[in-house]
A protein has these predicted regions:
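Hydrophobic alpha-helical membrane-insertion signals
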Residues: 1-32
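Anion-binding and metal-coordination hotspots
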Residues: 9, 56, 67, 75-88, ...
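Basic, short loop/linker segments at the boundary and entry of helix-turn-helix/winged-helix-like folds
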Residues: 26-71, 442-444
């Protein structure tokens, strides 16, 4: 049997410093290494202010790299998400060298030390890469997509509903004012308020102020609560004040809408628009969202524009103006789908020396071979030398009227053609349902733009 004596051991312990490195774990073509390489070539003083940083703070270059990696990899990352990535993602551990900045450290860095916004840094990086890499900036491919906003889908505001409800509310206000006039007339008081046609909140507030003065002069007190009987004038006062507040709410809705037809109460910048349809749950049809436009050159994202417009047509010119503001020039070619092919966009390209590479509505329909199904479409009609149309029966359309449309950015001349030979035509039932005959609206300048775009694309 082995016996062990009790004793106290005096022994020094030396802790070994294990510095874990992820140098071999991060691939050579990973985006984190690209961020490190780009930040090594730039003047970091343009982005980070080192003048008031404490000696015990995190390295400003490291924090900038972590921030750029998060936005390049995820598009957006909150400060808490950044702190979580530094604890769980080896790419962030590789840049941070196993340091774990808290979300407060990232917040202080963004608020106190970061000179430029993330968007300005994005464009500055693009300028640097344009000088370092062979990027063909003459061609900018444009496309857009819709992102759902972080807003409840039941917080909608519709312009038509707001207009209708405001009109009804104003009628109630006028009825209340008539009852107020009747009240003063019965009291033999020479006081009469006008009935306005258009809603005017200031006018209603002046009326309520006058009623308050009347009640104060006559010793009538405002009473509220259970068991209190309101006077007749107070009832009228409460009704008018409630209706005025409702009109004020509608005025706020119009300010939130701007020139749009819908918006969200919790996110006024978001517009209700059609999303991609979910064929499994039958959802995502109409929700608040944003229209995000992206321009790419040689695989590099050169420009981003976030819009509240539901369609892509109205986003093209603001998108290009932002590109010109950031880079000082415009690309020579902007290939895009048919959602961008409009008269205003083509005119903008013509004025700024941009070649027409945008498709237009009906582009694929025109490329189809003429058959018995599509022969009655205007795009498959024969054309005359001066741009007129000839119907399948061989009759030429005549000019009915010429109008000028000034609703867009550029004025355009629209020509309405009408065919007076539809009576007795054997194709009439398949060609038109109009009583006066088949009519076509077209613009000569837009037709020329379509021909040029079709030639450039093919």
């Amino acid at each position: 049997m082995i016996h062990q004596q009790d004793y106290t051991a005096y022994q020094t312990y030396a802790l070994l410093d294990f510095n874990i490195s992820f140098e071999k774990d991060v691939p050579a073509d990973d985006i984190s290494r690209a961020v490190i390489e780009v930040t090594e070539r730039i003047d970091i003083n343009k982005f980070v202010d080192f003048t008031h940083r404490n000696s015990h703070g995190y390295d400003g270059l490291m924090m900038l790299r972590l921030l750029l990696l998060a936005f390049a990899d995820n598009g957006y990352a909150s400060t808490r998400k950044l702190a979580e990535l530094c604890r769980t993602d080896i790419r962030y551990m590789f840049i941070a060298q196993n340091q774990k900045p808290s979300h407060q450290a990232f917040q202080r860095f963004i608020h106190d030390d970061l000179i430029m916004s993330v968007e300005d840094i994005f464009y500055e990086m693009n300028r640097i890469m344009e000088d370092e890499l062979p990027i063909d900036t003459d061609v900018l491919c444009i496309d857009g997509t819709k992102y759902e906003a972080n807003a409840n889908k039941n917080t909608f505001i519709w312009r038509k509903n707001t207009v209708r409800h405001r009109e009804r509310q104003w009628k109630k206000c006028n009825d209340t004012i008539k009852r107020i006039n009747k009240f003063f007339k019965e009291k033999n008081i020479n006081c009469r308020y006008s009935i306005l046609r258009e809603p005017n909140i200031d006018y209603l507030l002046r009326v309520t102020d006058k009623i308050e003065i009347y009640m104060k002069d006559n010793g009538i007190e405002f009473v509220h609560g259970k068991g209190c009987r309101k006077s007749d004038i107070q009832k009228l006062y409460d009704e008018l004040a409630k209706e005025a507040m409702k009109l004020f709410e509608y005025a706020l809705h119009f300010d939130m809408l701007g020139d749009r037809n819908s918006c969200s109460k919790t996110d006024p910048d978001a517009t209700f628009m059609h999303m991609k349809y979910d064929y499994y749950n039958h959802t995502n049809v109409f929700k608040p969202g944003y229209n995000v436009q992206v321009g790419v050159s040689d695989g590099f994202i050169r420009n981003i524009y976030v819009s509240s417009d539901c369609s892509d047509i109205q986003t093209y010119i603001p998108f290009m103006e932002k590109y010109k503001l950031m880079y000082g020039k415009l690309p020579l070619k902007t290939p895009a789908d048919a959602g961008y092919g409009s008269y205003d966009n083509y005119m903008y390209c013509r004025e700024n020396g941009i070649e027409l590479f945008m498709k237009y509505p009906g582009y694929y329909e025109e490329s189809k071979k003429t058959n018995d199904k599509n022969r009655f479409r205007a795009s498959h009609f024969e054309r005359t030398e001066d741009g007129g149309y000839i119907c399948p029966a061989g009759h030429e359309f005549e000019v009915d009227k010429v109008t000028t449309d000034t609703r867009g950015i550029y004025a355009r001349n629209n020509i309405k053609l009408i065919n007076h030979h539809c009576d007795g035509c054997p194709f009439r039932s398949r060609c038109t349902k109009s009583r006066i005959g088949r009519s076509i609206n077209y613009c000569k300048e837009l037709d020329e733009f379509h021909k040029e775009a079709r030639k450039n694309i093919t």
